[in-house]
Amino acid sequence: MVNEQKRFALFLATSDSTFVKKAYGGYFNVFVSTFGEDGEQWDLFRVIDGEFPDDKDLDKYDGFVISGSLNDAFGDDDWIVKLCSLCQKLDDMKKKVLGICFGHQILSRIKGGKVGRASRGLDMGLRSITMVTDAVKPGGYFGSQIPKSLAIIKCHQDEVLELPESATLLAYSDKYNVEMCSYGNHLLGIQGHPEYNKEILFEIIDRVVNLKLMEQDFADKAKATMENAEPDRKQWQTLCKNFLKGRSEQV
């Protein structure tokens, strides 16, 4: 019996920058190269531009990924409200949904959590987050051994301020109480960016500085976090793939 091709969808909640288009061909390629594997089908829906799958097609997918965004997850833009409605349907269907940054906050919003401006302000750079090892089940998407901490690239000004009762806190940091959380076995939110690398982060920082939206001193400090350290990208990649594809390889 031949296994059916797995099918996933990316809900892109941001526009491709000129740099990302030139260097990677767009954010879709960044996500697929991070979370995708040979033999899979990945579809792109630019939700920020109003592109959404038909309800009748949702069951054809094995999982979904919601990207980061410059927009507020607590906003009432038409496309954000529609995305929330879609995610509620996926939750009811118990479909796997991985939320990254803005996507993480969207998942909390639809489950009844509180999302807003980060209480300790904008965060950019490499950060270490601590796992709540008691909350993580061995043999799940972390594998048999749970790491005490993992480094990840951060780039956000909003956060999950209060988790809903249905959430399980999986990770926190010295600056934010909610760095990663799950809802049942089918929704997973990560505040950081497993898909980012140093090149992508630095270009975003430079662009924000040029727009006069960030002080140079703050930008320099953000870049300095990656002078002698790197994100645990392979571990995050394994974790996210395990979650989306129902595996338990060691992170």
UniProtKB/Swiss-Prot annotation:
Key words of the record: Cytoplasm, Hydrolase, Protease
Subcellular localization, as worded in the UniProt entry: Cytoplasm, Cytosol
Glutamine amidotransferase type-1 domain mapped to chain residues: 17-214
Domain of life per record: Eukaryota
Main location: cytoplasm
UniProt GO BP: proteolysis
A matching Pfam family: GATase
Active site: 101 (nucleophile), 193, 195
Single Gene Ontology MF annotation: peptidase activity
Pathway named in the protein's UniProt entry: Secondary metabolite biosynthesis
Enzyme class: hydrolase
Entry's EC annotation: 3.4.19.-
GO cellular component: cytosol
Family: Belongs to the peptidase C26 family.
Functional note: Involved in glucosinolate biosynthesis. Hydrolyzes the gamma-glutamyl peptide bond of several glutathione (GSH) conjugates to produce Cys-Gly conjugates related to glucosinolates. The gamma-Glu-Cys-Gly-GSH conjugates are the sulfur-donating molecule in glucosinolate biosynthesis.
Record PANTHER family: GAMMA-GLUTAMYL PEPTIDASE 2-RELATED, GLUTAMINE AMIDOTRANSFERASE YLR126C-RELATED
Protein name in UniProt: Gamma-glutamyl peptidase 5
